[in-house]
């Protein structure tokens, strides 16, 4: 993102990164597919004795890790496109379309998953490669960027090192929060503490740990990542905080949904039911991602974000008390409505807030809201679910869903902190 802000290519600032990132993605997918050729490799003995894994798994891991780097090259470029080429009064609609297109891979996964069951791995890889190539060509050939005529000055300090330090801070704060949650569970003797008190205390510590790690991680991370400009970009920092609150909640709710269906509803086919739930969320998300973007241009971003948080909270509340499949699907509908509205309105607000000349750097920082969402929601929620499930089977999932509902509400309550809604 920082490098794309200063790119003077004739293609513009963003398209070179989108193009090369997508092409490198294809190379990495070939590495992933190539792992199949190492299944009976004579190198297995070396890899197993040295690293404890087979040669095939080592190549697979290498391809996946490299794919994280190359895909983020493309993502860094595409994130800066909307603030670069879309007028402010149309960014809600553009963000809605962006959210819609980002959901298509979820449908693609549902379509190609049966091919994996049939062991048609290379067909799956070629399909993914075709999508990377097709969407890259569509973007590069259809987008009209105005190239920079001269390279902007370098950001003060060492921005790459600042970004690395930002990541270390975020992970460290999250691990500290996890330690506090585990400690609160140990401080309450199981034989003398009532169950409701343990749920209340550990649950409250968990919510404070999640919300606190998000706030502290983003706040201090932004000081490091943005530098001296952070003092004048408080609205942007609060935007990242609210974004991470919501993404941590919805991502973790989705991740634990199958275990809830399996252990609480005790259905014989939890994977199938979870697929149906994902489809319901996807359908309602599609509806509101476009509509929400349009409405945010007309009504304002924060009003739509408040509605999104309330809808998602209702979805988690319904999920907690769901004991039938139809009720789970109704909960999924509310989660989809809230998520679609949030994704379009929130990104539109973010593109309004970032400085145009540094859009790549700022929106790159917001990537931590996506990556950090999984760290916060799952690393704290997972051990909490295990703790309560050990006390009473199935209890852990309603408890952590309640915490995720709390994050949805906190994301709404913090919206007034975003006092500036545009750089203009």
Residues covered by each model-derived region:
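Helix-to-loop junctions at the C-terminal end of transmembrane segments
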Residues: 1-11, 117, 288-300, 385
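Intracellular juxtamembrane helix-capping segments at the cytosolic ends
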Residues: 73-86, 341-355
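Short amphipathic helix-loop junctions that connect adjacent transmembrane helices
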Residues: 182-196, 255-272
């Amino acid at each position: 993102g920082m490098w794309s802000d200063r790119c003077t290519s004739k293609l513009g600032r963003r398209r070179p990164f989108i193009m090369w990132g997508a092409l490198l993605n294809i190379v990495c997918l070939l590495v992933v597919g190539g792992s199949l050729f190492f299944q009976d490799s004579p190198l297995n003995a070396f890899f197993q004795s040295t690293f404890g894994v087979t040669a095939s798994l080592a190549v697979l891991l290498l391809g996946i890790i490299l794919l994280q780097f190359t895909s983020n090259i493309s993502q860094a470029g595409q994130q800066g496109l909307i603030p670069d080429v879309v007028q402010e009064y149309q960014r809600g609609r553009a963000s809605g379309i962006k959210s819609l297109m980002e959901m298509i891979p979820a449908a693609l996964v549902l379509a190609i998953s049966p091919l994996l069951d049939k062991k048609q791995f290379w067909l799956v890889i070629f399909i993914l490669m075709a999508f990377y190539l097709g969407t890259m060509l569509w973007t590069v050939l259809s987008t009209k960027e105005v190239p920079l005529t001269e390279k902007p000055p370098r950001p003060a300090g060492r921005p790459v090192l600042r970004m690395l330090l930002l990541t270390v801070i975020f992970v460290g704060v999250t691990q500290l929060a996890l330690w506090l949650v585990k400690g609160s569970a140990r401080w309450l003797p199981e034989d003398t503490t009532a169950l409701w008190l343990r749920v209340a205390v550990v649950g409250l510590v968990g919510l404070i740990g999640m919300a606190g790690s998000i706030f502290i991680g983003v706040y201090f991370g932004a000081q490091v990542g943005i530098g001296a400009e952070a003092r004048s970009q408080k609205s942007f920092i609060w935007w990242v905080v609210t974004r991470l609150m919501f993404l941590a909640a919805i991502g973790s709710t989705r991740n634990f949904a199958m275990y809830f269906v399996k252990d609480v509803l005790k259905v014989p086919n939890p994977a199938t039911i979870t697929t149906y739930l994902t489809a319901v969320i996807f359908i309602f998300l599609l509806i509101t991602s476009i509509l929400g973007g349009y409405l945010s241009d007309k009504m304002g971003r924060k009003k739509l974000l408040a509605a999104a948080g309330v809808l998602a909270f209702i979805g988690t509340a319904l999920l907690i008390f769901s004991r039938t499949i139809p009720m789970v699907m109704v909960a999924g509908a509310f989660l989809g409505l809230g998520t679609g509205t949030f994704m379009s309105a929130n990104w539109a607000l973010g593109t309004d807030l970032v400085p145009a000349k540094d859009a790549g750097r700022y929106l790159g920082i917001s990537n931590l809201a996506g990556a950090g969402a999984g760290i916060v929601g799952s690393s704290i929620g997972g051990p909490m679910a295990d703790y309560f499930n050990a006390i009473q089977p199935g209890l852990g999932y309603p408890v952590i869903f309640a915490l995720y509902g709390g994050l949805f509400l906190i994301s709404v309550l913090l919206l007034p902190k975003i006092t500036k809604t545009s750089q203009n």
